[in-house]
Each structure stands twice: as C-alpha cells, then as structure tokens.
C-alpha cells in the first residue's frame, strides 16, 4: 500500500469539539508522525498541525471527518514524494 506524507492543518474555534477531535485522531494514530498544538488565547482558538504518513484515502477520510466537526476547519498539504 503506497503512502503519502502530508500535513493536516486544523483550526478549532469551538472548544467543545476538542474531545471528538482527539477521539478521531486517536483512531488514526498509527498513521501519525507527529503533532503540534498551539493555543491562541487572544482569539480563543487552537491551531493544530498533524504530520501523517498514510495512504491517500486514509488522509482524505481523516480530513473529511475532522471537517465535519462543528467549529473546526481543516486542510491537507501533501508532499510531492
């Protein structure tokens, strides 16, 4: 199974979304290379970056699931390799 390296950028504007977001990320933890979270207190949002190495369909499914959460925005950027 071919994999791709990607960075999934997430902006959380609804603090109630953090529990379902963490549960979703836990489901895909075997694909996660690393994670960085930045609380931006002045704007009351959280910025999260997830580095993954996974098949394209797994990345798309994860990103789609994250985007369905209320108050959460996400985008993925892929490596060309």
Predicted regions span which residues?
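Long, contiguous binding/interaction regions
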Residues: 1-81
């Amino acid at each position: 199974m071919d994999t791709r390296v990607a960075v999934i950028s997430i902006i959380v504007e609804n603090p109630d979304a953090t529990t379902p977001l963490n549960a979703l990320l836990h489901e895909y933890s075997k694909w996660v290379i690393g994670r960085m979270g930045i609380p931006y207190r002045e704007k009351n949002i959280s910025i999260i970056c997830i580095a993954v190495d996974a098949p394209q369909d797994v990345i798309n499914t994860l990103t789609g699931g994250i985007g369905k959460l209320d108050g959460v925005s996400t985008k993925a950027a892929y490596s060309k390799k």
